[in-house]
Amino acid sequence: MGDELALGVRAVSGAAVYRGMDRATLDRQYSPSSRVPSLDAYLRAYERLSAAARRDHPVRAGLAYGPHRAERLDYFPGPASGRCPLLVFVHGGNWQALGRAESAFPAPALLAEGAAVAVIEYGLAPDVGLDAMAGMVRRSVDWLLRHADRLGFAPHRLHLCGTSAGAHLAATTLLPDPADGPDVSGLIAGAVLLSGVYDLEPVRLSYVNDALRLDEAGARRNSPLHRLPARLPPVVVARGGNETEEYIRQHDRMVTALRPRTAITEVVADRRDHFDLPYDLGVRGTGLGDAVLARMGLGDARMGLGDARTGLGGTST
């Protein structure tokens, strides 16, 4: 009962599978769309805004960073050739949905502030396993760094950003000794983790694993919380105010684990949810936007580098 009360979840009569929750409750906790009126409305907005980004800004679309048909990225060049930072965006979708077509919407605000942007596509479950997905993200980073001069960004200013499942994959890319793909852990200037899952054991026990097919060992191997090294690059860890209790718990655990290892900026955007939080990337005057711009060394972002909570774009100590 104590775990359920701590989570703010109603006690249930079914067999408990994780922290006092039955399978149906756990499934709801790992279904972020349970907290919003319409997931489809967000997905349509992602697609519409991403199409506008490609229409209104120069882009090198469909660049192959690896041999798999899904290993493609779209590159939006920044204004300061050879010197600008790069934000690499890894989309969400529960490791089984979305792609480049819906994921360029953060680019315009970041481009306006002087960054280049790369939008990554990767293989999805059930066709591609989680180890291989993580390897693809690593290969994308490795490819971008090897082609930095040609693309026109500063390789020592590459920042990796992911949302939801993409936050998990971005966090995994920070870890040394990968199971798949090149080790790029020491080559990333900073990371931005939005509404992520960092311990996959509850995911393994939920409906999400119907596609992921993780066993206990695979869940642990792919859980960044269990493998964090002693030192990491600076990290912005953010979530919306309207997240499920389990997503909030995952966020809190990651923040606690990162504090002794790196400089961390925590952002809680009280009026944002799991799906609209990424809209604030690069947007001045929002907690997330200011934190990311400050970490990337762009402009005179108004928020200092520390913990933050605000209303629409959120932060506080």
Please tell me what each predicted stretch does.
Residues Q29-S81:
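N-terminal cap/lid segment of alpha/beta-hydrolase-fold proteins
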Residues A101-V119:
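Short amphipathic alpha-helix adjacent to the substrate-entry channel of hydrolases
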